């Protein structure tokens, strides 16, 4: 695979790629040595220098883990992508991710989403403008049924989905807009669909 590298150097390069792919950052010199059976850090440094001279990596000598993969055939630097469903409508009594609700998908790096179940909604209206959420924005929502006071949520009320700040009061739920010209909504019958964790906007 790498005709100008020895087997040991190939093992080192493949290990670096795997660690970057799995963890998002390169291994230390000691970790490389442990992985390929080299006790001497100076020997590892020697192999890294050869790999760098061959054009497969770039190092920053002032930092302990600064190894950048330059090999164009490597997928170590490629972020995996997930396609998040964009929900066109929210129907009472129906699962939010029901196929008929999904109008499109939006690509995001997997490390943004992690292992959460997420969806996106397009915001309609100006009730959350002071929170930086504008009419037409796409919001990224982590699906969950509970929320803490002050969190921005997507909630179902009167068979409609709304984006507001959540506050649990003595006997009622208050859904607070972030717009001084709009009044809060008070209700006992509120279903939390998820917490807003991101906002995406196209600037024209």
Curated annotation (Swiss-Prot):
EC number of the protein: 3.4.21.88
Chain residues forming the annotated DNA-binding region: 29-49
Site (Cleavage): 92-93
Any one biological process term the GO annotation gives: DNA repair
Origin superkingdom: Bacteria
Catalytic activity entry: Hydrolysis of Ala-|-Gly bond in repressor LexA
Keyword list, A-Z: Autocatalytic cleavage, DNA damage, DNA repair, DNA replication, DNA-binding, Hydrolase, Repressor, SOS response, Transcription, Transcription regulation
Pfam families, A to Z: LexA_DNA_bind, Peptidase_S24
Gene3D superfamilies the UniProt entry points to: Umud Fragment, subunit A, Winged helix-like DNA-binding domain superfamily/Winged helix DNA-binding domain
Active-site residues annotated for this sequence: 127, 164
SUPFAM superfamilies associated with the record: LexA/Signal peptidase (SSF51306), Winged helix' DNA-binding domain (SSF46785)
Signal peptide: none
A GO term for molecular function: DNA binding
Similarity remark: Belongs to the peptidase S24 family.
Function: Represses a number of genes involved in the response to DNA damage (SOS response), including recA and lexA. In the presence of single-stranded DNA, RecA interacts with LexA causing an autocatalytic cleavage which disrupts the DNA-binding part of LexA, leading to derepression of the SOS regulon and eventually DNA repair.
Protein name per Swiss-Prot or TrEMBL: LexA repressor
Species per Swiss-Prot/TrEMBL record: Desulfitobacterium hafniense (strain Y51)
Lineage of the organism: Bacteria, Bacillati, Bacillota, Clostridia, Eubacteriales
Gene: lexA
